[in-house]
Amino acid sequence: MAADETSTDFGFARVPLDEKQGRVNEVFRSVARRYDVMNDLMSGGLHRAWKSALISALRPSRTRPFRLLDVAGGTGDIAFRALQAGGPETHVTVLDINDAMLAVGRERAGDRFAGRIDFVAGNAEALPLPDGSFDAYTIAFGIRNVPRIERALAEAYRVLQPGGRFLCLEFSHVDVPGLDRIYDAYSFRIIPHLGALVAGDRESYRYLVESIRRFPTPGAFAGMIEEAGFAHVTHRLLSGGICAIHSGWKIA
């Protein structure tokens, strides 16, 4: 967040800090029903490989109890993958601030994974969960929408038990010469058009593209993760830097 503590980025605009969450909620309420379809269209299906890479890094236990908190995971995409990869004692709590996204997730879950998944309404900056209650915390393509990222990271640290792991999958900054220009042209010209055509909402997808550009560089975000108390902080760039997996451990 910028030095001005009363305002923050909303895409390329500056808005009062206390207004951002409401605006973000409206974006995701608008796109919830088409969210996963749009992810396929926007990424050409690559988001599936990126999420698989996140689950491979997570490695949920197949032989012992494993408790995962997936934040901003309303539609259940990460949760379902983790449950399929883990053992019978893997349990996922999906937390999202947006009721429309949670409704999609509950509908998709149906009767699958009975007793192994729950959906909770909550704010990443003030998790309604006890200290040290999870083995791992994941957040995929969500942390850039949080008004106070440092608070979300502090909350992630709080709810993890010692030895727990923080994993964040987020869009990043393309580092391949030539690809950066192609990616920018695609992002700013094509994605909002797809949003208008498929989801009936050009402006929400324009915000999502702009929010990617405002997100910190991998090095800067690593510094924020370390400031929250995490150790052994690393990141791995995917697809030429289009996105990255960030990792940190709670040692004590």
UniProtKB/Swiss-Prot annotation:
List of residues binding S-adenosyl-L-methionine: T75, D96, N123, A124
Reaction(s) catalysed (UniProt annotation): a 2-demethylmenaquinol + S-adenosyl-L-methionine = a menaquinol + S-adenosyl-L-homocysteine + H(+); a 2-methoxy-6-(all-trans-polyprenyl)benzene-1,4-diol + S-adenosyl-L-methionine = a 5-methoxy-2-methyl-3-(all-trans-polyprenyl)benzene-1,4-diol + S-adenosyl-L-homocysteine + H(+)
EC number, UniProt record: 2.1.1.163, 2.1.1.201
Record field: transmembrane: none
Metabolic or biological pathway, per its Swiss-Prot or TrEMBL entry: Quinol/quinone metabolism; menaquinone biosynthesis; menaquinol from 1,4-dihydroxy-2-naphthoate: step 2/2; Cofactor biosynthesis; ubiquinone biosynthesis
Keywords: Menaquinone biosynthesis, Methyltransferase, S-adenosyl-L-methionine, Transferase, Ubiquinone biosynthesis
Gene Ontology MF term list: 2-methoxy-6-polyprenyl-1,4-benzoquinol methyltransferase activity; demethylmenaquinone methyltransferase activity
Single Gene Ontology BP annotation: methylation
Cited SUPFAM superfamilies: S-adenosyl-L-methionine-dependent methyltransferases
PANTHER family, per database record: 2-METHOXY-6-POLYPRENYL-1,4-BENZOQUINOL METHYLASE, MITOCHONDRIAL, METHYLTRANSFERASE
Similarity comment text for this entry: Belongs to the class I-like SAM-binding methyltransferase superfamily. MenG/UbiE family.
NCBIfam families recorded: MenG_MenH_UbiE (TIGR01934), PRK00216.1-3 (NF001242)
Role according to the record: Methyltransferase required for the conversion of demethylmenaquinol (DMKH2) to menaquinol (MKH2) and the conversion of 2-polyprenyl-6-methoxy-1,4-benzoquinol (DDMQH2) to 2-polyprenyl-3-methyl-6-methoxy-1,4-benzoquinol (DMQH2).
Protein name (database record): Ubiquinone/menaquinone biosynthesis C-methyltransferase UbiE
Originating organism: Methylobacterium nodulans (strain LMG 21967 / CNCM I-2342 / ORS 2060)
Record gene name: ubiE
